[in-house]
Amino acid sequence: MSAMTRVSEVIIGIVSAGVVSALVFPRYTGEQMRTTVRKRFGSFVDYVASALSGQLDRAHIETIHTRFAYVVGFEAARSMAVFEDPDTRMRSGRLARLNSEFMSASSRFHALHQLMNRLHAAGAQAAIDAIEPYFREIAPLLTRNGEPVRTSIDAAHSAEQLLAWRDALPRRIRATRAELETQPDFPLLDFDTAAELLYRFITDLQEYAATYASLATATHERERWIERYEPRTNKTAATIAGIRTATVILALGWFWIETAWPSGVMLVLNAAATCALASSAPRPTAMAAQMGMGTALAVCTGFLLTFGIYPRIDGFVLLCAALAPLLAIGIYMSLKPKLAGYGGAI
């Protein structure tokens, strides 16, 4: 009977949340996808242009780069939007390709940035002075008439400029290298590495811009793409998560058996759920700590509701009015990445 009650509660919760989401606060995955694609493309292009033109501090470049690490979430949203929106379904292949190309471009740019950091740390100023003029030529390619790239037309224009610039790059690099070979003790290996990374990055960026521009049309040749993004789980991380969960369950199970606590079954079940949720977080320990503190806050809130508010209300409407503010706080916290653990526990 208890199991049937829980199933009924879950079903009612899903139906209620679905009705409210569809009728009261309609937010469609397809629209969110389009907004995310536009925002991410514009932000990344501006970031690259500012970084390569020297407008960003090197430490600030590293901080901004971490904001673009939402590849898995984007792929999950694309998979859901395919069933909801016919326009997204027609562009599904290009969206998957866009995600993969963005991952390649951002990774390549990060590698180039790390190489330049190493050259700065090693004091290889000659190699830096030789390659940086090429960097400063890229920012104008990512604008149209001096304005930032935003629309598909702007992206197509930038893709054409990047392609032409990339095709001319090997010849120019060879000419520069021929001049540098005459200089004794010049770090040619560092220059060659930077030039190769730059060429590969421009190739990835041009592909990314071309795919973004192709989204303006319902059908496009770039839709026919065989590769797919396949997330892979780190075996070491999975093993550690399994050991951590087993240790917690065994410890709490021993405590339950030794104390004969009537609520021990709920303790073990909640611990297993907490370990499962925490294992998917980048920092499982911090997430578990947040969920623990959120649970403590929820207990205090529960005492307040049970003994302070419930005796003074009568009827379903007043019950909703009493619960809504506290539930809203938990939902708000769960939407903030830094507070998600607290909100999820509440």
Curated annotation (Swiss-Prot):
Q: Where are the transmembrane segments?
A: 10-30, 248-268, 291-311, 315-335
According to Swiss-Prot or TrEMBL, what is its membrane topology? Multi-pass membrane protein
A Pfam family annotated for this chain is: FUSC
* Annotated localization: Cell membrane
One GO CC term on file: plasma membrane
Q: Which UniProt keywords apply?
A: Cell membrane, Membrane, Transmembrane, Transmembrane helix, Transport
Q: Which InterPro entries match?
A: PHBA_efflux_AaeB/fusaric-R
Q: Name one GO molecular function term.
A: transmembrane transporter activity
Superkingdom, natural source: Bacteria
Relate the protein's function as given in its record.
Answer: Involved in the resistance (detoxification) of the fungal toxin fusaric acid.
What family is reported? Belongs to the aromatic acid exporter ArAE (TC 2.A.85) family.
The name this protein goes by in its record: Fusaric acid resistance protein FusC
Q: Which gene encodes it?
A: fusC
